[in-house]
Amino acid sequence: MSRTTTKTFFSGALALLFGFAANIALAAEGDNFVDEASAKGIAEIETAKMALDKGTSEDVKQFAQKMIDDHTQANQKLAQLAQQKNLEMSDEATLMDKAKAMILQLRDGENFDEAYANNQVVAHEQTIELYRDYVEGGDNPDLKQFAQQTLPKLEEHLKQAKELQANHGQQN
């Protein structure tokens, strides 16, 4: 992939991802937070599965497995909490559709590792923003506690994603 193509690819991807930033304002409501956080978790899991399949670097694959493990666990806790608190949660198909809309069309080979690393930085920055916004202005104390407890792991993921980006990704 040429530099121009890569920049165009990431510009389009960023435009798509920033479109979801408008939804963050809705995150103050518990149901909306549950849906957005779940969809972002599913997107993390699905892109990580792609990285295990298409990635070429061992560090990318190790990071991807960690994303699958950690985000599966977080989504399970979130679903359990939503059920306990009688919060409405979109069905799995709707959440998967939201997640798919967040997933970049990642490329094969070396460029896949680059695209995945760059995607993970942006995705984790947005997820951290969603969780921080809920901690600061959310309406459900239990969800606020979940968000607060999950933030350190998300921040750790962002740090690791930035390390991957330094090794494999495009730096702007």
Summary of predicted features, one role per range:
Residues 2-172:
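His/Met- and acidic-residue-enriched segments that coordinate or traffic transition-metal cofactors
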